[in-house]
């Protein structure tokens, strides 16, 4: 996770700072190392076959348990570090009045984007059925609870991207230029899963182009919310919602919807226009 790199740098360069959340940082770096080992093992270890002859890795559930257990310890150490240390290193959760409004705005924009996409594909009636299904809302609120048990994954990105790298790039390339460049960095960071998870390698380049559209446009919105609230938990929660609401509102109620997608070059222009109109407009607002 990018956050682990930030923490390692702070542990080395600011080890004399009494406000450094040392225990919290050390734990997160160690957790990241464990997840790296598990990831490598899942790639190198031979895959098993389930009863349906589908390939699966025995390391996948192990990684889930590590993330869940790690998230529990994460919250304990974060709270134990104290307000002063959290405030000194951007871990504080303040300005919740405006923060909640930003999160609700994102949910509204996300659903608007979903409705437009369904309308363009002629599936608006199916989306209406999904929204009217009580199971959808049960799963939705279950997903919200799961945030607390999977937080390390989203914190791991956003503490590195939004808390550390965004201000650094904005200082060098301007408020807007820094955010756009960060979106490009964020997109490239997703390159392996673009080729081997979201799609198959033959569609990898189209998936990467689509990732640039998503990361730049969504990154603009997330950057705005962070500058507006100075609350790192806002982009963390938005990142979580963005990754998980598709599972709910696609009607599949399964993360499998993210895997082996069909992404074609002809889809990119429409996605670019729609994402910039829905998320990118905030670049013209003052934070």
Q: Locations of the language-model features?
A:
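C-terminal membrane module of polytopic membrane proteins
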Residues: 201-208, 232, 238-287
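Membrane-interface capping segments at transmembrane-helix boundaries
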Residues: 11-18, 79-87, 280-287
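Hydrophobic alpha-helical segments embedded in the membrane of multi-pass proteins
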Residues: 208-224
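Alpha-helical transmembrane segments in multi-pass membrane proteins
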Residues: 1-12, 16-78, 101-104, 127-129, ...
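Membrane-interface helix-boundary motifs at transmembrane edges
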Residues: 12-23, 86-94, 166-174, 226-230
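Juxtamembrane "helix-exit" motif on the non-cytosolic side of transmembrane helices
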Residues: 38-52, 116-124, 192-199, 249-256
